[in-house]
Each structure stands twice: as C-alpha cells, then as structure tokens.
C-alpha cells in the first residue's frame, strides 16, 4: 500500500461516500453499515464513537503502535459518520484546527465561550 501524500483528500472523499449512505439519499440499512448507523442515529454512532475511543485509549496504554493507528482510524471513521449526520464536513473540523494553530492551548481554552 502506498502511503497517502499530503495532497490526498481522503477525509473529503470518505465524507462524500458517507453522504450517499444517508437514508434520505437512498442509503439502505440492510446493505450498508453506515446507512444502518445513520438510520438509528444518533445513539448508534455515538455508542461506536465511545467504544472506539476506549479501544484507542487501551491501545495507547499498551504502547501498541499498529493498534493505535487502527483504532484511531476506527474512531475517525465513526466521527465522520457523526459529522455526516449533522450535515457537517471534515473541512469544518480542519478549519477549526487551522483557526487554533499557533495558539497556546491554555490561551485557546480561555477564549472559548463558557457554558
């Protein structure tokens, strides 16, 4: 497998595919895992996000690089499903990361609105 280059837009391509799995776009829960998650949303994909985050924590705690990569991919995928459900795109998240770039973590946190 050739590693992706910096110019690859894999997150955007995955988001495009996920959008076709939305029930209102004709996604069939009988034949598509994503359509099934979206048809049971949000509980189904939120549960998966929690499971994948826990598995990532366990892999990191065990110091297993291959599992860390695999579990991160699983977590990101299910986060992309959540973005799809809420009509958001990975580009929205990337824009937020770009906005935060160069800020001190403490400074950025202090700028957030209080609930």
From Swiss-Prot:
It catalyses: 1-(5-phospho-beta-D-ribosyl)-ATP + H2O = 1-(5-phospho-beta-D-ribosyl)-5'-AMP + diphosphate + H(+). The gene is hisE. The keyword Amino-acid biosynthesis applies. It comes from Bordetella bronchiseptica (strain ATCC BAA-588 / NCTC 13252 / RB50). CDD domains: NTP-PPase_HisIE_like. GO terms for cellular component: cytoplasm. Keywords: Amino-acid biosynthesis, ATP-binding, Cytoplasm, Histidine biosynthesis, Hydrolase, Nucleotide-binding. This is Phosphoribosyl-ATP pyrophosphatase. It is an enzyme of class 3 (hydrolase). It comes from the Bacteria.
């Amino acid at each position: 497998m050739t590693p992706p280059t910096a110019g690859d837009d894999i997150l955007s391509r995955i988001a495009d595919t996920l959008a076709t799995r939305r029930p209102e776009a004709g996604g069939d829960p009988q034949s598509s895992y994503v359509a099934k998650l979206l048809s049971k949303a949000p509980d189904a994909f939120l549960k998966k996000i929690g499971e994948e985050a826990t598995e990532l924590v366990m892999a990191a705690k065990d110091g297993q690089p291959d599992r860390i990569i695999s579990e991160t991919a699983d977590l990101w995928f299910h986060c992309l499903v959540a973005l799809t459900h809420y009509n958001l795109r990975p580009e929205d998240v990337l824009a937020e990361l770009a906005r935060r770039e160069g800020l001190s973590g403490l400074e950025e946190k202090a700028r957030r609105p209080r609930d």
